[in-house]
Amino acid sequence: MSDSETDLLKSVLDQTEATIAAVAATQEHLPTPCPEFDVARVVDHLVGWAKSFAVRLSGRPATGEPNDYRAGPVPAMEFHHAAEEIIGAYREGGEQSQKLPVGFVMMEFLVHGWDLAIATGRSTSFSPAAADLALDTGRAMLKPEYRGPGKSFGHEVEVPDAAGSVDRLVAFLGRDPAWKAPSV
């Protein structure tokens, strides 16, 4: 993959890390646009998957299910270390990085980073180019059988033709881009 794709991923990871770091203890039980997760579970999910992708990209054997991960007392630091490994692996261009599309990794962190930001009342500034790459990857990889109740992804939500790139991506993965937290 290109350096520009890796730079886009780094930007998404950096913004997601900052959002994780800004979560207050009083926000942990707030709902999110991802209906099965509250804020604390989105943080756990982000950290668990960052660690999982870092392990996978390094070629080390997997140790546990990322969806079962529970972050420690400083989740932003855990996320930061895993994100550094992820970026390092893509910059090195090893065999494992060729098997895991950068757009797929970007999709995971951009969408759940958006979930977390929206739920905690933070603004997002994810790059349209990052969202477009993630959306293109998602459209190529996500099969209909992966969508629906009890599945990894919700059904696509319709958005206007003029919707921005991030809104189109989150809608593709079953989120309502107009979702608002009940109270922040």
Question: Which positions does each model-derived feature cover?
Answer:
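Structured surface interface patches that mediate subunit assembly and partner/cofactor docking
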Residues: 2-18, 22-35, 48, 52-184
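Extended, alpha-helix-rich binding/interface surfaces that flank or overlap catalytic cores
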Residues: 42
